[in-house]
A protein has these predicted regions:
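Conserved catalytic-core segment of NTP-binding enzymes
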Residues: 1-77
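Residue-level recognition of oxygen-bearing side chains
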Residues: 23, 84, 103
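A general structural signal for short secondary-structure boundary/capping elements
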Residues: 33-37, 56-58, 86-93, 110, ...
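Short hinge/gating elements
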Residues: 44-46, 91-98
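Phosphate/oxyanion-binding loops and surfaces in catalytic or ligand/nucleic-acid-binding neighborhoods
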Residues: 64, 68, 82, 114, ...
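Beta-strand-loop-alpha "switch" segments that mediate conformational coupling across diverse proteins
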Residues: 68-95, 108
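NTP-binding/hydrolysis catalytic cores, primarily Walker-type P-loop NTPases
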Residues: 94-145
Length: 145
């Protein structure tokens, strides 16, 4: 995590998940090797019931990070909880391949597109999340699983 120019923290509305996410960020911000200017930290709210709940998850984490760590995090978006996502998890397959028209699969596409768009303006992040998502979408579009 310290070597990455981007960190994507995936959390859920459950209190234990928020606590774990904050603990990770706390250890990151307090590490002397962590470079705040070089690292972009984003939060993805996963398995939420609404866009408002997703934003609320981010707001809670952002408040404590700002107040106690004097840090900055951005909102990467949200992935809704739906039956297709639950089924894909049980089958151990990506929901974007298992049920590409589901709400959660579409949300993953929106989040990936926004992360890629944000990276195009940040040239120094050329080995960050855009590279990861570019490879995934290329494989998906070519039909490779």
């Amino acid at each position: 995590v310290l070597a990455s120019p981007e960190v994507l923290v995936v959390t859920t509305p459950e209190p234990t998940s928020l606590t774990d996410s904050y603990s990770l960020l706390k250890s990151l911000y307090r590490n002397p090797k962590f470079n705040r200017e070089y690292t972009k930290i984003s939060v993805l709210s996963n398995r939420v019931t609404s866009a408002a709940e997703g934003r609320g998850v981010y707001d809670k984490l952002n408040t404590v990070v700002g107040q106690f760590l004097e840090g900055e995090i951005t909102y990467a978006g949200m992935i809704p909880r739906d039956s297709a996502l639950e089924k894909a998890i049980r089958m151990q397959k990506p929901v974007s391949l298992q049920a590409p028209l589901s709400k959660s699969a579409r949300a993953f596409e929106v989040v990936a597109a926004e992360l890629l768009q944000g990276e195009s303006s940040d040239a120094y992040r050329s080995f960050g999340l855009s590279r990861l998502f570019s490879g995934f979408w290329k494989q998906k579009n070519e039909g490779v699983e």
